[in-house]
From Swiss-Prot:
UniProt biased composition (Polar residues): 100-109
Identification of the protein by name: U3 small nucleolar RNA-associated protein 25
InterPro entries listed in its UniProt record: P-loop_NTPase (IPR027417), UTP25 (IPR010678), UTP25_C (IPR053939), UTP25_NTPase-like (IPR053940)
Coiled-coil residue windows: none
Protein source organism: Botryotinia fuckeliana (strain B05.10)
Location of the protein in the cell: Nucleus, Nucleolus
């Protein structure tokens, strides 16, 4: 299979969030320097093939001292205990006319001629294989539920409020202005965007793109001071006014974008504002679901009352029921979203809540308080990254584990949802439940980058495609822009991340085609180099590469010709060198070079990647601290998933700079600072050397600062020193 080792037989779409036979979060993202090594993606790199990846220094001590150094220190051992595909993207189908669409459903649903079963053995073998794959599925997530037809209720509306033309729900989805919509769709087809820039108080800068033409210009940002300024269902309005009478600066600036149905890329998410962002997005999602459902029920009632209902054209729904998709990194992040939603809805009943708690909630403290705050936010609780969950709303009840086609909101990790969809080469492929998604919320997108971003790309490529089956749809009620294959222009995408990356930027420009517009909110950076709290000589060396494709080879050639000689010239001086390598593919290349090149034969080295076993990690750290390893190779994803406290670091070499500026501070200030405190390094003697190219400009801005990045990328000199 292109994306893993198995497909999964599903007991109702939305089930099966179980484990898989492959491990290791992440994989190649399509390029030679993708995050992670092999395709697939879960866990923290356990279960990879093992081979020699170290060279010990020759010591004159006796065998007893050698055996003692093999054992990890008490500090390291305790930390170990506590830390314990090439995708063939489905082409987007050409626009179908309403008649052609109906004919395809009629053809698919027509009786099929009976065929003799000629190959019984083969079919039985396939059934056995499916059963074996089912055994590897998490039973707690299985859904045994029939797919329901369209909503037929005629009563039970949350509140029978009048349609408000000023409501963004009306203006964007229900009754958009035909003239404005037509004009903007034409601009979208031509790829024309008019830029508007505005300053958001205490937040950053918003660059808003509206389908149209014209020169970029500044505009005053809109703000909403409290929930009073939102068009909310009355029940939600009553609850949120009690919880949040007024908005903070972030909510005031972001609310107009979110509730105005514009696409949003927000790259300033952190542990301090995570709760506010979660509340705002969940409120918006539930408000959208309630308005959609109430409109359908209200129109059902109208049709039931009217004598001449054939004259009524009430287009109020999509092909399938699910309207909101939330892509999240872990089960714990799903728990936080669900808890926020229940606090806003205050349902009288919660069906299958105990089952949800048993499957998703883990109240044990997995990590000690010495782990960074952002690490504990991401990995606290149940950190399994293989899950999917359907949530269904009725008038008084929230139902967990509803079948996808019966759900209003789908929560999933990228891996969990991709396995639910299936693979194009497999017999069972189903993405019709994504055909009518109107809001996508991607929270902690930077964490998803450290898993396998190709799963996210795959999911976005399968959003809002016209369905292959009717699924009981009443086509007389389907909105015209669904039938015209324009749903992608109405979908709102919201991505929340701690920082911007080329992958997020690409998704923002290629997948965000919202006719309402899109906004990117970011801030300026003073630079992590100024936030170390430690005197360290920091040297940044620029390499010039012609293209991003040639960057890995140019970087390797620079490393072997300019940096390796400084280590081998006096191998004793190389002791305590930490070599940080962001990409797993680069890590493999450098590790093999250390293992096989005669040039590095005088250097002893160890290595820690996301696929290194805990026992091997402990040994590598112990040998590095004792001096048996001069050099320690260390990947960014290993640091992301474990945050090891490595001792004995006297010099840091960065083969490439990290995406996350927090990692820079933890490695440079944290590791070198610890060596100073423990007396292994004289104050002021620690050093850093980092290699970068113009393709690293986003990373470099966060590390060196917004004011310095352009000079470092464009100036003639290629070496920049900071103290």
């Amino acid at each position: 299979m292109a994306f893993g080792q198995r497909n999964t037989s599903r007991g109702g779409r939305g089930g099966g969030g179980g484990g898989s036979s492959f491990r290791g979060r992440g994989g190649s993202r399509g390029g030679p320097r993708g995050r992670g090594g092999m395709r697939g993606g879960r866990g923290r790199g356990r279960g990879r093939p093992v081979f020699d990846s170290a060279r010990l220094a020759q010591k004159e001590e006796d065998e007893e001292s050698d055996s003692e150094s093999e054992e990890p220190s008490q500090d390291e051992a305790s930390e170990e205990e506590s830390s314990d595909d090439d995708d063939d993207d489905e082409p987007v189908p050409a626009v179908k006319s309403y008649t052609a669409l109906m004919q395809s459903f009629t053809r698919d649903s027509a009786p099929q001629a009976k065929r003799r079963k000629l190959n019984v053995d083969k079919e039985e073998k396939e059934d056995e294989d499916a059963d074996l794959m089912d055994e590897d599925t998490n039973e707690a997530d299985l859904v045994e539920e029939e797919e329901e037809g369209p909503e037929t209720a005629t009563d039970g509306i949350l509140e029978d409020d009048e349609e408000d033309k000023a409501d963004p729900f009306e203006a964007h989805f229900a009754n958009p202005d035909d003239n404005i919509l037509s004009r903007r769709l034409q601009h979208l087809e031509k790829g024309q965007w008019a830029l508007r820039m505005s300053s958001l108080a205490k937040v950053g800068t918003a660059i808003t793109s509206i389908p149209g033409d014209g020169e970029p210009r500044a505009m005053k940002a809109m703000t909403i001071g409290s929930p009073e300024g939102l068009k909310l269902k009355q029940k939600l309005a009553n609850v949120i006014k009690k919880q949040r009478p007024t908005f903070d600066a972030l909510e005031k600036s972001i609310a107009p974008l979110v509730f105005g149905y514009q696409d949003l890329l927000f790259t300033e998410r952190n542990t301090s504002n995570a709760e506010s962002l979660r509340r705002l997005t969940c409120l918006h999602a539930v408000n959208h679901v309630f308005k959609t459902r109430d409109r359908v029920i209200k129109n059902n009632s109208r049709l039931a009352r009217e004598d001449s209902s054939d004259d009524l054209e009430l287009r109020d729904q999509g092909f399938t029921r699910p309207k909101v998709l939330m892509l999240l990194p872990t089960r714990e992040s799903c728990v936080r979203m669900v808890d926020m939603i229940t606090s806003l809805c205050e349902p009288e009943q919660q069906e299958n809540r105990k089952r949800f708690n048993d499957s998703f909630v883990d109240k044990e403290e997995n990590y000690s308080t010495d782990k960074p705050e952002d690490f504990r936010e991401l990995f606290a609780g149940n950190d399994d990254d293989m899950f999917r969950l359907g949530l269904k709303f009725t008038r008084k009840t929230i139902k967990y584990f509803s079948q996808f086609y019966n759900s209003d909101i789908i929560f999933a990790s990228p891996l969990g949802l991709r396995m639910a969809i299936g693979d194009e080469d497999a017999k069972k492929v189903d993405h019709d439940f994504l055909s009518s998604i109107e809001i996508v919320i991607v929270d902690q997108a930077d964490a998803l980058l450290m898993q396998n971003w190709e799963h996210v790309e795959f999911i976005f490529d399968h959003l809002n495609l016209q369905p292959k089956e009717a699924h009981g749809c009443d086509f007389s009620r389907v909105r015209s822009w669904y039938l015209d294959n324009n749903a992608k222009y109405f979908r709102q995408n919201i991505a929340l991340a701690g920082f911007n990356t080329p992958e997020l930027q690409t998704m923002f420009y290629t997948q965000s085609q919202n006719w309402e517009g899109k906004a990117k909110v970011s801030s300026t950076y003073p630079g992590a180099i100024q936030e170390l709290g430690l005197k360290v000589k920091q040297t940044f060396s620029r390499i010039d590469t012609e293209s991003i494709a040639s960057d890995p080879q140019s970087r390797f050639e620079y490393f072997t010709s300019a940096i390796i000689p400084t280590l081998t010239r006096r191998s004793k001086d190389s002791s305590g060198t930490l070599l940080f390598i962001p990409s797993y593919m680069d890590f493999v290349k450098v590790r093999n070079y250390f293992s096989t090149s005669a040039t590095t034969s005088s250097l002893s080295f160890g290595s820690i990647s996301e696929y290194t076993t805990p026992k091997e990690v402990a040994r590598a750290r112990s040998h590095f601290f004792s001096g048996r390893h001069n050099v320690l190779l260390y990947t960014e994803r290993a640091h992301h998933f474990r945050r090891y406290q490595i001792r004995g670091v006297k010099k840091v070499i960065m083969y490439g700079i990290p995406e996350n500026p927090i990692f820079y501070k933890e490695i440079v200030a944290g590791y070198l600072g610890r060596s100073v405190r423990e007396g292994d390094l004289e104050p002021g003697n620690g050093s850093l050397r980092a290699v970068f190219s113009k393709w690293d400009s986003m990373k470099l801005e966060r590390i060196a600062g917004t004011e310095r990045v352009n000079k470092m990328i464009k100036e003639k000199g290629d070496t920049f020193d900071f103290l």
